[in-house]
């Protein structure tokens, strides 16, 4: 081929052929395999790097040879299967690696051990070379991969499957690996040579300082390599459990081993092993994909378990059904018992015959490798999936996804659904019969033959179908028209058939009664005795309840229907034990007959099956596991049973049972031989969950832990692991730094420091109170912080491995040391010291205190037990030691204490008379708290010594102390001060001498003046000093808030300055007058001024300066406050402006850019561009608009997720905003994909506003030539899946919030239909009611399921008009051509458009879809449409369609009254209205509490909620309102109107029925209503027959016409139940049903009582264990630990009284049930029938010839009374066209039509249909060129191109392949939404 291309001269073709050749691909894959570097390279590198010399060269060669040989063996193992099986199993690693590693470890570390005994050097050298060779060979076979993973090596295996010339591929891939390996080794050598020759590395100072670094590295390299190898292998082997340590399961029944190569019975359930040693991550998954377990599927070790059951002395085989519904620990396991005809209770036990096998022979039968190593994880599975049908788990069968050649469409093709057993059988035949010659027909001949046979069969079926449809058109609708199904005959002579429920031909392999049990994990341990299991037995729904969970026993199934269903089930009547014994089987049968006769009827007739049917010889082999695993809870529940396992094997969440009270009842019979009961005691325990990650959930003990991939734990304590891919989805940012918050915090701290320095005398009382409050808050915060720290410490002790054992041992040791060693030795030492100090010893007092100390053992939570009793499992669960009346050593004991001091000491001791012991022997107030300061022994001694020393110091040393003070004062004066004083003294003395010499007469006067001046000076000095001292008080900056205080202070300063000023003026005047003496003449010459006058002048000058300085000082003091205030304000303003400017600049830039982008985006529309530019180009006035923005933000609730609002609600809010604001959404609304998701009315409204392009209003689908199946899939994107299912698929939680549409009321939204404001369009919505589905029969269940499949196929018709793709029934042509819509409510009423959301109910949710409350994270409740809390069991209304066949456009209703016409007597086509419950007469309802957005309309249009008898009738409207709109109405509002008398209308319409629990006055009113109703119904019939035009009151009339079908059902049930148990009041009955049916609430204590109640319980537990509890009780009451006010002294307190008193509070339990993938797959098909996110308004386009309207009306008229026979199978009257054919013929006809034999791709394309497809959003016009018959044709097709998932999706339905892969159904809805242009 290559040569031919070369000769042709086509270089491109030549290159492509070379690239795609096997050799090149092998080289490529081999080269890639080089990069899967493993530990084997360590040996190779070690030999090449370290070895030197001649021996080193040989070792290098041997290492390289061994390495290449090992890799060659790995490549050969790909081609050679036995070698691959030998090397690709985990036991190979275990067998080879562990001994070899041990040997290699000793070899490297103890070489001298092997050197002894060696004779010659040569032999050892050769041995070492051989060891090097073996090292590299063996380690290459170990298949370890470090970098990056083994995936590159597995690519070879993938291509090997596709390659034809496999040997050439293996050779070329090995050559490619060899080339890559040589490149890698050369690269390593180059790096080493570069390191050796690099001077910068060699000249490094660290390397130069150590001369022998290289030699030391060489010497220790061997040890380094051995350590690396050891760590690597331990890392890989650490995930593999040792086969010796693991425990074999205890088998419940032995198994038969058949066939070749059958190995061990104890093998795993699910295998996560993959080739090449790595394991698939399965630990966190809840469902395992069967496609991953391809190796398990062909397991030769399968166990075909056949349990033999003896009934009436005959051996019967169990009939187990291969229908898996996996629940993880959610289903309880019960025993099965069967009854013989003699009803003998002794013979009713289940007898399992075990094959007796000698274990000794069994040992030799099994191979050694299998005994030691199970190649699928030994004897332990990873998860244990329990089947709900059977006791033991059913093994997964072989996957149907098996590739093999088969004939398809007349040609040989590879089928991926080929049965593997068939292909294996064919290969065996080909090997055995080698002489058999197979004649292969040519492909054309095969194809022609297939075409011929297909056309023949298609014509026959079409002819038959046409004949039957003609019969239907001739108004002869009889049951004979329908093709009969093949039924299983029970009795050939009498021709009795099995009931439909048990007919294997009708129900397939999944027949039988499926029980459903609530999750036992979530239930509280305290209420386990009151736990009620609900069983669905036949058609009895929520009637039979178990009353005592603890006393479950083997009971007898007396139902007639157990002929084929022998599965394990819940016993119906585990009655509590009475004095006479348990109820006998005859009594049970009588009670069962009552229920059986009242309720169970056959689907077609009213005849009751009463004759018992024996167990027949019908059996199927179901491979199941021989062992039964249980978890911890199941083990505790089944401890009284005989067959319980010794220990639980399934790991559950880590729990600790906190023991509270043990009741030891020793009142046993002394003569009884059974002494085991003496040790048994009733224990009351709390369950405490460990606060740690629950990564071990449901893992089997000893199983291999799968390696977690793509998970990172970033924090020290992290609750959940996070993948790095989804770190951006975490709401909390990793790093957050609030700059403004930090600045505020610093400023507050600084201001607080400044203000605390100011001490003002007149501090107000209000400030004191505020400070006290602040201190209390700080204390509270500190307490919370300490509590949090304590919890963290406790959790840390709980997390660390073996930490509790170490801590407990230390605590016990510390307690012993403290009590018996430390304190006795301290007492002895103290008293000896007292004797030596000649004082009396205090032995008796100390020993009394020592004996008073009690060491009470407590649980980990602090619940007190006793001194000697240790908590259960205290080494693992933890322990606390509480010390009561702790002993403190005292230096002396006071003989007499004053009474006041005694009381004070007693109060102090009561506060500190207990503590907890820490690990270090310290004392703490609370467990894990901080250690408290202990009393010191020497402190009182030192205190007494100090007192005595003070007394001694007082008298003799007083004089010395005074002298010391004087000396210090004198010494403190500075030298300069001394000098200045001395100078002034000498100067004054000189002046006096001079004056006395010159003028002795003036001496007296001058002395007088001097004295006067001195005295004045002294006065001035005193005044001035006082003034300065007063004025120099440091006045600190005051708080800005203390304005009154600052004003008062300023006033004081003003007064002070004024007085100082007056005093200064006085002094100056006195000084001037002092020198004027009239008696003495002083002759002073005019030329000379005497010296004293100069001195006085200078002193006066200085004094004036001082005065000026004083004024300045006073002014500064006065203005300091305003100055500081101005300074701080300036700082604040600068900081604020800085903070504001930065976001303002960025936001301005952002808005500028955004406006440019918007302008660029909508450049086509000039007007829009101008408007947006005007609105968006304004600069931001940040500060001025600040208040407005804050007010806007405060109006919104930040917690509300916008995604939880519906589309209608969002547009309703947009409509209420200003007109200009809508332009902000213009670019969103003008996006070309938006038009598909907007309602037409909203589009019209936006078009009138000018913000929606008219050309975007209706988009065309251009892909009309695409395959029809693909186009259909595009219309069904991921929003279709039900909300409950999407919550199970975690990544799509937001889709549920998107789909939760709300009720919206908008006045003028629809302007297009403004002329039709008075028109009321009746559209019914589909009701969500999961629980009620259980009451329907199994036949209806199966019928609905198959209808869902049929209609699912019909949806592919008219695929390109998505409106018409949702017409899943055959609509009728009505008289007035009225529009019909399904699943959605649109009510046009007085200009209002109310979009009532239509719920989507999955068809087969009935058996196991309890609402998963825990998954609804964004809501606090369940949707109100799902449950109705009423006693009357309403019939399941899956879906109904109201067709007002006689409706008139002129029908009007008043807008004041809610008159909804949604219950019509006419029946729908496909989903009939099974029952019509009585509705509330809304027209008479006057008072409403609130009506938010017409919410009550939907409430009133629902079926009745039985308001007259409900749990709390006051809450009915409030409850419904709240659970619908939780974000609007706070939860507190539900309790505000508790005592308000809500006037609820009791006028509930009924027909010929009475409620069981109605009072007499209500019954009379109902009778009157029934009379009125008959008159109204007759009027309605007249109106309908005459088709009158004037029907103004049609709404109110029809609302009164509703019937309550389920009432008979409920009343009959209630009568029987009241016979069983009499109740005191209606409330008790309601509470009973409310609790027992729904089990969705729990009672908890009030929050305020929680802590006090726990404290009381702790004290009770201690007092119950004490012999004399009086002292402890009194001390605990004094300490306040035991609260007397919450002690319940009244004995007979009921739950109601407790709830009235507020002690108990009702709150919901979050139930969680995991459904298997099979259910989700069915849902993904069924749910596609409905489309919740978009309303479908469908026009009628099929005509009368399809199904005659008259015939339908007649058929409806024949069955007007649905109440007479509730289980009447009306689905036989539903005209899906294929209904006339049987299921198999129907399926065959579809496939024949799909195979258009002359089309190449096998898909039928109708040119007429494809060319006339209408646009999206338009109704189908009935035009003339459309032929009606062609529209009616069935255009089904099967095989899509290039989509494996689609094929497997439809494969489950077309071919009844029930074991399909779970992933295929879901993936269809997980595709991203395709943009349809």
Swiss-Prot record:
Keyword Transmembrane: yes
Pfam family name, one: Ycf1
GO biological process: protein transport
Entry's transmembrane regions: 18-38, 67-87, 90-110, 127-147, 175-195, 224-244
Subcellular location: Plastid, Chloroplast inner membrane
Keywords: Chloroplast, Membrane, Plastid, Plastid inner membrane, Protein transport, Transmembrane, Transmembrane helix, Transport
Domain of life the protein comes from: Eukaryota
Membrane topology: Multi-pass membrane protein
Classification via InterPro entries: TIC214
Primary localization class, coarse: plastid
Ranges of Acidic residues composition bias in the record: 259-271, 284-298
Quaternary structure (record): Part of the Tic complex.
Job of this protein: Involved in protein precursor import into chloroplasts. May be part of an intermediate translocation complex acting as a protein-conducting channel at the inner envelope.
Family affiliation: Belongs to the TIC214 family.
Entry protein name: Protein TIC 214
């Amino acid at each position: 081929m290559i040569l031919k291309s070369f000769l042709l001269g086509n270089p491109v073709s030549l290159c492509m052929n070379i690239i795609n050749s096997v050799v090149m691909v092998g080289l490529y894959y081999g080269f890639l395999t080089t990069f899967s570097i493993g530990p084997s390279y360590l040996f190779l590198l070690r030999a090449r790097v370290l070895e030197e010399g001649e021996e080193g060269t040989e070792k290098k060669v041997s290492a390289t040879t061994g390495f290449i040989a090992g890799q060659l063996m790995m490549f050969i193992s790909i081609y050679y299967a036995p070698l691959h099986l030998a090397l690709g199993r985990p036991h190979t690693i275990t067998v080879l690696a562990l001994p070899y590693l041990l040997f290699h470890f000793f070899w490297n570390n103890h070489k001298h051990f092997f050197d002894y005994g060696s004779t010659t050097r040569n032999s050892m050298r050769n041995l070492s070379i051989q060891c090097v060779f073996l090292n590299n060979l063996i380690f290459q076979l170990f298949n370890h991969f470090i970098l990056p993973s083994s995936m590159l090596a597995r690519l070879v295996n993938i291509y090997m499957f596709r390659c034809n010339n496999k040997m050439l591929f293996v050779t070329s891939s090995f050559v490619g690996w060899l080339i890559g390996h040589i490149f890698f080794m050369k690269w390593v050598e180059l790096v080493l040579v570069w390191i050796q020759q690099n001077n910068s590395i060699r000249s490094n100072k660290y390397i130069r300082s150590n001369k022998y670094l290289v030699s030391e590295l060489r010497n220790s390299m061997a040890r380094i390599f051995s350590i690396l190898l050891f760590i690597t292998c331990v890392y890989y082997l650490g995930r593999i459990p040792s086969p010796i340590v693991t425990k074999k399961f205890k088998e419940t029944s032995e198994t038969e081993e058949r066939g070749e190569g059958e190995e061990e019975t104890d093998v795993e359930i699910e295998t996560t092993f993959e080739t090449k040693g790595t394991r698939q991550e399965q630990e966190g998954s809840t469902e395992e994909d069967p496609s991953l377990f391809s190796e398990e599927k062909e397991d030769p070790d399968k166990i075909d378990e056949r349990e033999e059951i003896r009934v009436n002395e005959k051996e019967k085989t169990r009939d187990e059904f291969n229908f898996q519904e996996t629940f993880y620990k959610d289903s309880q396991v019960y025993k099965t018992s069967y009854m013989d005809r003699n009803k003998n209770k002794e013979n009713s036990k289940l007898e399992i015959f075990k094959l007796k096998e000698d274990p000794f022979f069994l040992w030799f039968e099994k191979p050694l490798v299998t005994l030691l190593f199970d190649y699928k994880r030994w004897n332990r599975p990873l998860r244990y999936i329990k089947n709900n049908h059977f006791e033991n788990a059913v093994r997964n069968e072989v996957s149907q996804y098996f590739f093999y050649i088969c004939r398809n469409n007349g040609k040989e093709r590879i089928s991926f659904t080929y049965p593997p057993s068939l292909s294996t059988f064919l290969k065996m035949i080909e090997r055995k019969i080698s002489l058999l010659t197979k004649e292969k027909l040519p492909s054309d001949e095969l194809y022609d033959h297939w075409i011929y046979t297909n056309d023949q069969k298609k014509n026959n079926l079409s002819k038959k179908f046409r004949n039957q449809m003609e019969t239907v058109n001739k108004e002869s609708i009889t049951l004979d028209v329908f093709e009969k199904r093949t039924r299983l005959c029970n009795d050939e002579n009498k021709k009795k058939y099995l009931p439909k429920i048990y007919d294997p031909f009708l129900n397939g392999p999944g027949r039988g009664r499926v029980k459903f049990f609530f999750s036992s994990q979530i239930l509280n341990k305290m209420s386990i005795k009151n736990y009620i299991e609900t069983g669905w037995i036949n058609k009895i729904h929520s009637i039979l309840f178990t009353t005592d969970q603890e006393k479950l026993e083997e009971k007898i199934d007396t139902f007639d229907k157990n002929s084929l269903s022998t599965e394990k089930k819940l016993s119906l009547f585990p009655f509590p034990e009475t004095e006479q014994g348990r109820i006998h089987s005859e009594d049970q049968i009588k009670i069962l007959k009552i229920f059986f006769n009242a309720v169970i009827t056959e689907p077609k007739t009213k005849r009751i099956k009463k004759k018992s049917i024996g167990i027949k010889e019908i059996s199927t082999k179901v491979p199941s596991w021989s062992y039964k695993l249980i978890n911890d809870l199941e083990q505790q529940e089944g401890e009284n049973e005989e067959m319980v396992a010794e220990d639980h094997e399934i790991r559950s969440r880590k729990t600790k049972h906190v023991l509270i009270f043990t009741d030891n009842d020793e009142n046993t019979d002394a003569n009884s031989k059974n002494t085991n009961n003496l040790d048994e005691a009733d224990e009351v325990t709390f369950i405490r969950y460990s606060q740690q990650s629950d990564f071990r959930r449901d893992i089997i003990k000893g199983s291999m832990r799968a390696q977690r991939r793509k998970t990172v734990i970033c924090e020290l304590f992290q609750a959940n692991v996070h993948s790095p891919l989804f770190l951006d989805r975490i709401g909390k940012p990793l790093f957050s730094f609030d700059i403004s918050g930090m600045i505020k915090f610093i400023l507050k701290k600084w201001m607080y420091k400044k203000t605390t320095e100011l001490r003002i005398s007149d501090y107000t009382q209000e400030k004191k109170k505020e400070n006290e409050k602040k201190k209390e808050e700080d204390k509270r915060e500190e307490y919370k912080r300490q509590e949090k720290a304590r919890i963290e410490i406790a959790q840390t002790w709980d997390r660390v491995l073996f930490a509790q054992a170490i801590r407990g041992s230390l605590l016990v040791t510390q307690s012993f040391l403290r009590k018996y060693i430390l304190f006795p030795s301290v007492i002895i030492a103290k008293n000896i010291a007292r004797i030596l100090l000649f004082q009396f010893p205090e032995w008796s007092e100390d020993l009394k205190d020592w004996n008073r100390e009690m060491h009470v053992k407590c649980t980990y939570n602090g619940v007190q037990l006793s001194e000697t009793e240790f908590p259960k499992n205290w080494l693992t669960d933890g322990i606390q030691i509480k010390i009561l009346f702790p002993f403190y050593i005292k230096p002396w004991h006071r003989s007499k204490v004053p009474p006041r001091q005694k009381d004070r000491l007693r109060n102090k001791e009561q506060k500190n008379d207990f503590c907890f012991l820490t690990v270090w022997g310290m004392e703490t107030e609370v467990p894990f708290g901080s250690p408290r300061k202990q009393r010191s022994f020497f402190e009182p001694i030192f205190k007494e010594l100090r007192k005595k020393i003070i007394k001694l110091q007082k008298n003799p040393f007083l004089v010395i102390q005074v002298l010391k003070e004087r000396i210090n004062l004198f010494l403190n004066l500075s030298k300069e001060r001394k000098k200045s004083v001395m100078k002034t003294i000498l100067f004054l003395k000189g002046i006096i001498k001079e004056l006395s010499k010159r003028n002795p007469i003036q001496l007296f006067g001058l002395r007088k003046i001097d004295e006067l001046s001195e005295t004045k000076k002294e006065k001035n000095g005193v005044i001035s000093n006082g003034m300065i001292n007063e004025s120099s008080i440091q006045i600190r900056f005051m708080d800005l808030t203390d304005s009154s205080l600052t004003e008062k202070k300023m006033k004081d300063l003003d007064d002070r300055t004024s007085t100082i000023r007056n005093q200064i003026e006085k002094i100056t005047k006195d000084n001037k007058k002092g020198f004027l003496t009239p008696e003495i003449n002083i002759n002073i010459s005019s030329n000379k001024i005497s010296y004293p006058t100069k001195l006085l002048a200078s002193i006066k000058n200085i004094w004036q300066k001082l005065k000026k300085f004083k004024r300045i000082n006073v002014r500064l003091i006065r203005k300091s406050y305003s100055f500081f205030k101005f300074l701080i304000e300036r700082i604040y303003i600068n900081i604020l402006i800085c903070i504001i400017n930065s976001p303002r600049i960025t936001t301005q830039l952002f808005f500028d850019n955004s406006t440019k982008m918007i302008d660029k985006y909508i450049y086509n529309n000039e007007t829009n561009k101008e408007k947006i530019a005007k609105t968006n180009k304004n600069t931001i006035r940040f500060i001025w608009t600040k208040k407005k923005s804050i007010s806007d933000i405060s109006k919104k609730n930040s917690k509300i997720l916008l995604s939880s609002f519906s589309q209608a609600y969002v547009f309703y809010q947009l409509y209420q905003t200003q007109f200009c604001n809508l332009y902000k959404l213009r670019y969103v609304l003008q996006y070309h994909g938006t038009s598909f998701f907007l309602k037409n009315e909203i589009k019209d409204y936006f078009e009138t506003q000018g913000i929606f392009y008219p050309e975007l209003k209706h988009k065309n689908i251009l892909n009309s030539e695409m395959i029809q199946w693909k186009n259909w899939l595009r219309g069904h994107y991921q929003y279709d899946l039900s909300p409950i299912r999407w919550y199970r698929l975690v990544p799509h939680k937001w889709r549920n919030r998107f789909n939760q549409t709300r009720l919206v009321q908008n006045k003028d939204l629809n302007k297009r239909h403004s002329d039709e404001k008075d028109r009321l369009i009746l559209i019914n919505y589909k009701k969500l009611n999961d629980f009620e589905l259980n009451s329907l029969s199994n036949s209806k269940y199966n019928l609905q399921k198959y209808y869902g499949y049929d209609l699912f196929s019909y949806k592919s018709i008219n695929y390109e008009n998505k409106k018409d793709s949702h017409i899943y029934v055959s609509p009728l042509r009505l008289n007035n051509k009225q529009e019909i819509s399904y699943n959605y409510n649109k009510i046009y009423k007085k200009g209002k458009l109310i979009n009532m959301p239509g719920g989507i109910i999955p068809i087969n949710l009935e058996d196991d879809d309890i609402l998963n409350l825990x998954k609804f994270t964004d809501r606090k409740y369940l949707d109100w449409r799902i449950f109705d809390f009423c006693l009357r069991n309403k019939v399941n209304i899956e879906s109904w369609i109201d067709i007002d066949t006689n409706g008139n456009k002129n029908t009007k209703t008043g807008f004041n009254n809610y008159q909804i016409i949604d219950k019509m007597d006419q029946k729908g086509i496909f989903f009939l209205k099974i029952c019509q419950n009585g509705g509330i007469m809304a027209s008479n309802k006057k008072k409403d509490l609130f009506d938010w957005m017409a919410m009550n309309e939907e409430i009133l249009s629902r079926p009745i909620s039985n308001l007259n008898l409900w749990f709390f009738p006051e809450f009915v409207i409030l409850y419904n309102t709240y659970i619908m709109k939780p974000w609007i109405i706070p939860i507190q509002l539900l309790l505000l109107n508790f005592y308000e008398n809500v006037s609820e209308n009791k006028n509930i319409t009924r027909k010929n029925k009475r409620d069981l629990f109605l009072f007499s006055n209500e019954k009379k009113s109902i009778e009157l209503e029934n009379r009125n109703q008959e008159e109204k119904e007759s009027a309605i019939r007249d109106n309908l027959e005459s088709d009158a035009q004037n029907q103004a009151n049609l709404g109110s009339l029809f609302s009164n016409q509703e019937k309550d079908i389920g009432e008979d059902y409920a009343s009959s049930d209630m009568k029987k139940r009241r016979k069983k148990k009499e109740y005191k009041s209606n409330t008790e009955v309601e509470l009973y049903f409310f609790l027992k049916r729904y089990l969705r609430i729990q009672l908890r204590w009030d929050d305020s009582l929680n802590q006090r109640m726990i404290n009381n319980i702790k004290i009770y537990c201690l007092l119950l264990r004490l012999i004399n509890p009086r002292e402890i009780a009194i001390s605990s009451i004094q300490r306040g630990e035991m609260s007397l006010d919450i002690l319940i002294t009244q004995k007979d307190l009921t739950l109601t009284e407790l709830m009235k008193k507020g002690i108990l509070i009702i709150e919901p339990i979050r139930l969680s049930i995991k459904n298997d993938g099979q259910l989700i797959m069915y849902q993904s098909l069924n749910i596609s029938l409905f489309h919740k996110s978009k309303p479908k308004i469908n026009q009628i386009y099929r005509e009368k010839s399809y199904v005659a309207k008259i015939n339908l009306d007649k058929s409806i008229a024949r069955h007007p009374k649905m109440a007479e026979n509730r289980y009447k199978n009306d689905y036989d009257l539903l005209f899906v066209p294929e209904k006339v054919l049987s299921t198999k013929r129907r399926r065959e006809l579809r496939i024949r039509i799909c195979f258009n034999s002359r089309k190449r791709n096998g898909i039928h394309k109708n040119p007429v249909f494809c060319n006339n497809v209408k646009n999206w959003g338009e109704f189908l016009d009935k035009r003339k060129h459309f032929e009606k018959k062609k529209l009616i044709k069935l255009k089904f097709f099967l095989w899509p191109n290039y989509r494996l998932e689609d094929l497997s999706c439809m494969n489950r339905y077309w071919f009844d392949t029930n074991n399909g892969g779970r992933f295929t159904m879901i993936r269809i809805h997980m595709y991203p939404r395709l943009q349809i242009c």
